C-alpha cells in the first residue's frame, strides 16, 4: 500500500514525517534540513523558489517573496487588514477574498496556491526519500481553525496534487507523538505556540486512546508577533536617532524582520543580542547603519502583553475540562516560540510544574501527523483519537436567540439534530441562520451562513416540524441540513465559503460570554416570556374559537380582554405587564376549561390550558425559527 505522510503546514516552518518500521521518522528536505521555511518566491528569471532558497533571497526580492501566508488562508480580506500592512508583499482584495500580488510573476495568487507550493515541495522531498510517489497525506491545522480555514487547507492540498486523508489539530497531533509508546494513563496539557497561532489542548492519553477534553486558543498569536515587537522597537529607535522610518522601505523592513527573528532566537540562550545592520538605508549625507543591543529584559518588557495573552486560553481550557492545575500530569511544549524563557516561565507559574521538554517542538506535530497517517494507512493499529470542536454551533431562533445544537468541546465526528417549527400561520419557508460562538444572542455570535427551506405546506404556526441536523466530520468541517418531516423536502449547506472568524473574535466570544452571563440570561428570559405570552394569546384565541357557544359570555369577554391587553404588552415589549398578565390569562383559561367540564358533568380539568404558555407545535418542546432573517452575503 502507498505511503501516507504526515505534514505540519506551519506559519513560518513546515515539516514532513512518515512511519517506517512502526516508528515515525522526520524526513529531511533536499537541502538537508528537517524543517522547511513556509516561504515561496518568484525570481526575476521566472523560477519559483520554495523553502530555504526562497527565504535567503527575501531581502533582495521582498515584493515577490511570500511568507506567513497561513495567516491569510481561508479568511476574508476585511478580516486581515492589519496583517496585510505587516508584510513586505502586497495583499489585495479580490471580491472580498484575499489575494497576494507578485509583480515578478505578473499575477495574483490565492493563499491556498502559495501554501500548495510548500506542500508540493514537502511531498516531492518525501517521495525522493521513500523512493515512491507520495499522493496521500494527513495535514495539521491549529485547533482553533474554523470551517473555512480547514477547507482552504484541504484545497491547498488538492492544488498540490495531494489527497488529504485527514485534517487534524496540531496539539492533538503533538499528543499522539508524545503518548505513542505510553501505556499508563496521563492527563496532559499541550501548549502550542507556533509562528502565527496559539493553541492549548487538555487530553487524556494512555494505552492507545487519545481523548481531547478541551481546547482553546488564539489564531493570531505567535512568533511573528514577537518579531513585530522587536521590529517596531528597532524602527522607532532608528527614527528617533536618524529621522527615518525604516518600515516604509520594503527592503529595510525585510532586513529588520530577519534581524528581529535572529535576535529573538539568540535571546533564548543569551541575555543580550547585538543587532548590526550596515547600510540599512541612505540619505544625501551618505549611508546609514543600524547598530543596537537588545537585552532579554527589554525583549520581555516589549512582549509582556503577548505573553499575558497566553494565559487566557490555558485558564479557559482547564475550566472547560473541569480540571485544576494539580490534575495535569505533564505539560508538553510545542512550537518554536515555546523556547522563549518568559513563555516557559509563564507555563511554570500557571501550572505549577516544569514543562516536559523531551519532544522536539519543531517536529513533534509532523511526527503526530505521521502516526495518524499510519493509522489511516493501516500501518498502525490500537490507536483511537477522539478530537473536539472548539466552538459551539447553532441556529438563530425567535427573538434573535442563538439555540446551540453542538456545544463547544463536543467530541467529533458528531451528528446532532433539533426539531423546530414555524413562527406564523401559513408560513411556507424557513430561513436557517447558522451561527458559531458562545453568546446567548445571534448578533453577538459569528454568522457562518444562511439557507432557505421552501415548499412547506401552509399550516397553523407550530404545526410543521422542521428537523435541523448539524453534522461535523472528522476533519472538523460542518454540514447543516434542514428537512420538513411532513413532506420529506430537505435543503443543506456546507459551511466552507462563509466569512470566517475575525482576529480576536473567538477568545472575545468566550470571555464576553462569561462577563455578560448575567445580563445575557436576563435578556434571554425576557424574550422567552415575550414568546410565551404571544403563544398563550394565540392558544387562547384558538380555544375560544373551538369551544364557541359553550363558553359563557362573561368568561369569553374576560379572556378576550386579557388577550388584547397581553398582545399590546408584547407589542410594546412591556416586561412588567407581560409578567402580570400571563398568569392572569392562564387562570382565566383554566376557569373556562373547568366550567366546560362541570357543564358536561365531569370534574375540574387541571392543565386544560397550557400553564407555561409553551410552543404550539405537536411535541410541545420545539423552539420556533423566526422567518424574518436577513440573508448573509
From Swiss-Prot:
Region (Disordered): 513-534, 598-633
Phosphothreonine sites (modified residues): 197
Record field: compositional bias (Acidic residues): 620-633
Bias kind Low complexity: ranges: 606-619
Compositionally biased intervals (Basic and acidic residues): 513-532
UniProt induction comment: By stress conditions e.g. heat shock.
GO molecular function: ATP binding; ATP-dependent protein folding chaperone; unfolded protein binding
Pfam families assigned to the protein according to its UniProt record, in alphabetical order: HSP70
Origin: domain of life: Bacteria
Keywords of this entry: ATP-binding, Chaperone, Nucleotide-binding, Phosphoprotein, Stress response
HAMAP family registered for this protein in UniProt: DnaK
Protein's job: Acts as a chaperone.
Family, per entry: Belongs to the heat shock protein 70 family.
Protein name: Chaperone protein dnaK2
Amino acid at each position: 500500500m502507498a505511503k501516507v505522510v504526515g505534514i505540519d503546514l506551519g506559519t513560518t516552518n513546515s515539516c514532513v514525517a512518515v512511519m517506517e518500521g512502526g516508528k515515525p521518522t522526520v524526513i529531511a528536505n533536499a537541502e538537508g534540513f528537517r524543517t522547511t521555511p513556509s516561504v515561496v518566491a518568484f525570481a526575476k528569471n521566472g523560477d519559483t523558489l520554495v523553502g530555504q532558497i526562497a527565504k535567503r533571497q527575501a531581502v533582495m526580492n521582498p515584493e515577490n517573496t511570500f511568507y506567513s501566508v497561513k495567516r491569510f488562508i481561508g479568511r476574508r480580506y476585511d478580516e486581515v487588514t492589519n496583517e496585510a500592512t505587516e508584510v513586505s508583499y502586497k495583499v489585495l482584495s479580490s471580491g472580498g477574498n484575499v489575494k497576494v500580488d507578485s509583480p515578478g510573476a505578473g499575477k495574483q495568487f490565492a493563499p491556498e496556491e502559495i501554501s500548495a507550493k510548500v506542500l508540493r515541495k514537502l511531498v516531492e522531498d518525501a517521495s525522493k526519500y521513500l523512493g515512491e510517489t507520495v499522493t496521500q497525506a494527513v495535514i495539521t491545522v491549529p485547533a482553533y481553525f474554523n470551517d473555512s480555514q480547514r477547507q482552504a487547507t484541504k484545497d491547498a492540498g488538492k492544488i498540490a496534487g495531494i489527497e488529504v486523508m485527514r485534517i487534524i489539530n496540531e496539539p492533538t497531533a503533538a499528543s499522539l507523538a508524545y503518548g505513542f509508546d505510553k501505556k499508563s494513563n496521563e492527563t496532559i496539557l499541550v501548549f502550542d505556540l507556533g509562528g502565527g497561532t496559539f493553541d492549548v489542548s487538555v487530553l487524556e492519553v494512555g494505552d492507545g486512546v487519545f481523548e481531547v477534553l478541551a481546547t482553546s486558543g488564539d489564531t493570531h498569536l505567535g512568533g511573528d508577533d514577537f518579531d513585530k515587537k522587536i521590529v517596531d522597537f528597532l524602527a522607532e529607535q532608528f527614527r528617533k536617532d536618524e529621522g527615518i522610518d525604516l518600515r516604509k522601505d520594503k527592503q529595510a523592513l525585510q532586513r529588520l524582520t530577519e534581524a528581529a527573528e535572529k535576535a529573538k532566537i539568540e535571546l533564548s540562550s543569551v541575555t543580550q543580542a547585538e543587532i548590526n545592520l550596515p547600510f540599512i538605508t541612505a540619505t544625501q549625507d551618505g549611508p546609514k547603519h543600524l547598530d543596537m543591543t537588545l537585552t532579554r529584559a527589554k525583549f520581555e518588557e516589549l512582549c509582556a502583553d503577548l505573553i499575558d495573552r497566553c494565559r487566557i486560553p490555558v485558564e479557559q481550557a482547564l475550566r472547560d475540562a473541569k480540571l485544576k492545575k494539580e490534575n495535569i500530569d505533564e505539560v508538553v511544549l510545542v512550537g518554536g516560540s515555546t523556547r522563549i524563557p518568559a513563555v516557559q516561565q509563564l507555563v511554570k507559574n500557571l501550572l505549577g510544574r516544569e514543562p516536559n521538554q523531551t519532544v522536539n517542538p519543531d517536529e513533534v506535530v509532523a511526527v503526530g501527523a505521521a502516526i495518524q497517517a499510519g493509522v489511516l494507512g493501516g500501518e498502525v493499529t490500537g490507536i483511537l483519537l477522539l478530537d473536539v470542536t472548539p466552538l459551539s454551533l447553532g441556529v438563530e431562533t425567535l427573538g434573535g436567540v442563538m439555540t446551540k445544537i453542538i456545544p463547544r468541546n463536543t467530541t467529533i465526528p458528531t451528528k446532532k439534530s433539533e426539531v423546530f417549527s414555524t413562527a406564523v400561520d401559513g408560513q411556507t419557508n424557513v430561513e436557517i441562520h447558522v451561527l458559531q460562538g458562545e453568546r446567548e444572542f445571534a448578533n453577538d455570535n459569528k454568522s457562518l451562513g444562511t439557507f432557505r427551506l421552501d415548499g412547506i405546506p401552509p399550516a397553523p404556526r407550530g404545526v410543521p416540524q422542521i428537523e435541523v441536523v448539524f453534522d461535523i466530520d472528522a476533519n472538523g468541517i460542518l454540514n447543516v441540513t434542514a428537512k420538513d418531516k411532513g413532506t420529506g423536502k430537505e435543503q443543506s449547506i456546507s459551511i466552507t465559503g462563509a466569512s470566517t472568524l475575525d482576529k480576536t473574535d473567538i477568545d472575545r466570544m468566550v470571555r464576553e460570554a462569561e462577563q455578560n452571563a448575567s445580563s445575557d440570561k436576563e435578556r434571554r428570559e425576557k424574550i422567552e416570556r415575550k414568546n410565551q405570552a404571544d403563544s398563550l394569546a394565540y392558544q387562547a384565541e384558538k380555544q375560544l374559537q373551538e369551544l364557541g357557544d359553550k363558553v359563557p359570555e362573561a368568561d369569553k369577554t374576560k379572556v378576550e380582554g386579557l388577550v388584547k391587553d397581553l398582545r399590546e404588552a408584547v407589542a410594546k415589549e412591556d416586561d412588567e405587564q407581560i409578567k402580570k398578565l400571563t398568569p392572569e390569562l392562564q387562570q382565566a383559561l383554566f376557569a373556562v376549561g373547568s366550567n366546560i367540564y362541570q357543564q358536561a358533568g365531569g370534574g375540574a380539568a387541571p392543565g386544560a390550558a397550557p400553564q407555561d404558555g409553551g410552543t404550539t407545535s405537536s411535541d410541545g418542546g420545539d423552539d420556533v425559527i423566526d422567518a424574518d432573517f436577513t440573508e448573509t452575503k
